[in-house]
Regions:
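Active-site pocket scaffolds in enzymes
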Residues: 2-134
């Protein structure tokens, strides 16, 4: 459960407001690097996560048929990596949304399995929809 913790992003909240709070899970990941269980029940028609820039108005809506989403905020970037046009990737200069199964499923018998056996086919859908909010 996330209610009452800095991990509760069910209502729009700036990530930066919560990322440094005194909370064990944030300390363990040096910030946000966690998996959230989605309440969309695999319905790809439902938005499972939204990011919006208050500066540019760019909005990212994520849709998936997966049961979870990993959110990572560049907690281990240190300025040694560069990207396009020599952009330096500094500490927490990014956010990544990765739709996936629950990461600890091999250790939880009552969770849906993430094991893929020989001959089985794996399919997953994820949509990243960008727009601009003015």
């Amino acid at each position: 459960p996330v209610e009452g913790t800095p991990m509760d992003f069910r209502c729009p909240t700036a990530i930066g407001v919560r990322i440094n709070q005194n909370f064990e899970q944030l300390k363990n990941g040096n910030g946000i690097d966690h998996n959230w269980i989605l309440n969309t029940k695999g319905d790809i028609q439902q938005v499972c996560a939204t990011l919006e820039s208050s500066v540019t108005g760019i909005v990212l809506d994520v849709y998936t048929d997966e049961p979870g989403i990993q959110v990572y905020c560049g907690n281990f970037l240190d300025g040694t990596l560069t990207g396009k046009k020599n952009t330096i990737y500094n500490f927490r200069a990014s956010v990544c949304l990765e739709t996936q199964k629950y990461p600890d499923t091999p250790n939880k018998a009552d969770w849906p399995t993430a094991v893929l056996r020989p001959g089985e086919k794996y399919e997953s859908r994820c949509i990243y929809k960008f727009s601009v909010h003015k």
